[in-house]
From Swiss-Prot:
Keyword match Cell cycle: no
Enzyme class: isomerase
Signal peptide: 1-21
A Pfam family this chain is assigned to: Rotamase
SUPFAM superfamilies according to UniProt: FKBP-like
GO terms of molecular function: peptidyl-prolyl cis-trans isomerase activity
Domain PpiC, chain residue ranges per copy: 154-253
EC number: 5.2.1.8
Keywords, comma-separated and alphabetical: Isomerase, Rotamase, Signal
Protein's UniProt name: Putative peptidyl-prolyl cis-trans isomerase jhp_0161
Organism in which the protein naturally occurs: Helicobacter pylori (strain J99 / ATCC 700824) (Campylobacter pylori J99)
Reaction equation(s) it catalyzes: [protein]-peptidylproline (omega=180) = [protein]-peptidylproline (omega=0)
């Protein structure tokens, strides 16, 4: 799963990287995929129509993921990255051959990209300055004490749910479950979930509305509140409303809560307070810029 996510995330970075890549030495050369000693020693991983693909072409990835290190990748992962780089270069060459890079649409797109990149670069510089600021220990400790129960208690629940559009539908389903003896309630819940739920994942999987394990902050607040209030083997006797519709929840199991100590939570708290400070500084700076700018809004 993680590898697939990584590979998908790299595509955008590779594309941006090749926009600034070196031009081909000979556009008429056929595509080569060689591992000559001279190229390898120079850090050339492959060539496409004479244009080298090197480790520096993956620098954009490192900017997005500081832990990225090409040399530490497995051989298959390196090959997959190089193959993606080759595919990107081939498409880029074809687009240039069709002179798409000279069209007004492309130039307008590039201007928009450059503007956004400049804004993001400026924001990155502001964030770097904020990171240099030391968050007082007392402020972090106070934040922990005020938010311990909401943010720093780990507890997982394993539940099923049935999602329907209306409250009346939910009440009808609850009534059907109520009629069953205790030993058969979960089986009835599974049957009704497979038949009546409008949750597309549960409907397609026909898994009895099984949500797997989740923590409080992973679900809608009202859903989590209702689910964690149940005891294993019990279900909600009134419909639970969220933005998705009306839920009936059946609790399979619930772990005992584990509270993170201040020292365990400290890195997270520091990051959260730095993010808050960053947003405050950004808003403050933008307001300062607004005061000195001439802004006209046409209506």
């Amino acid at each position: 799963m993680k590898k697939n996510i990584l590979n998908l995330a790299l595509v955008g970075a590779l594309s941006a990287s090749f926009l600034m890549a070196k031009p081909a030495h000979n556009a008429n050369n056929s595509t080569h995929n060689t591992k000559e000693t001279t190229d390898a020693s120079a850090g050339v991983l492959a060539t496409v129509d004479g244009r080298p693909i090197t480790k520096s072409d993956f620098d954009m990835i490192k900017q997005r993921n500081p832990n990225f290190d090409f040399d530490k990748l497995k051989e298959k992962e390196k090959e997959a990255l190089i193959e993606q780089a080759i595919r990107t270069a081939l498409v880029e060459n074809e687009a240039k051959a069709e002179k798409l890079n000279q069209t007004p649409e492309f130039k307008a797109m590039m201007e928009a990209v450059k503007k956004q990149a400049l804004v993001e670069f400026w924001a990155k510089k502001q964030a770097e300055e904020v990171k240099k600021i030391q968050i007082p220990e007392k402020e972090m400790q106070d934040f922990y004490n005020a938010n311990k129960d909401q943010l720093f208690v780990k507890q997982e629940a394993h539940a099923r749910h049935i999602l329907v559009k209306t409250e009346d539908e939910a009440k009808r389903i609850i009534s059907e479950i109520d009629k069953q003896p205790k030993a058969k309630k979960e089986a009835k819940f599974i049957e009704l979930a497979n038949r009546d739920t409008i949750d597309p994942n549960s409907k397609n999987a026909q898994n009895g509305g099984d949500l797997g394990k989740f923590q409080k902050n992973q679900m809608a607040p009202d859903f989590s509140k209702a689910a964690f209030a149940l005891t294993p083997g019990d279900y909600t006797k009134t419909p639970v409303k969220t933005e998705f519709g009306y839920h009936i929840i059946y609790l399979i199991s619930k772990d005992s809560p584990v509270t993170y100590t201040y020292e365990q939570a400290k890195p997270t708290i520091k990051g959260m307070l730095q993010e808050k400070l960053f947003q405050e500084r950004m808003n403050q700076r933008i307001e300062e810029l607004r005061k000195h700018a001439k802004i006209v809004i046409n209506k």
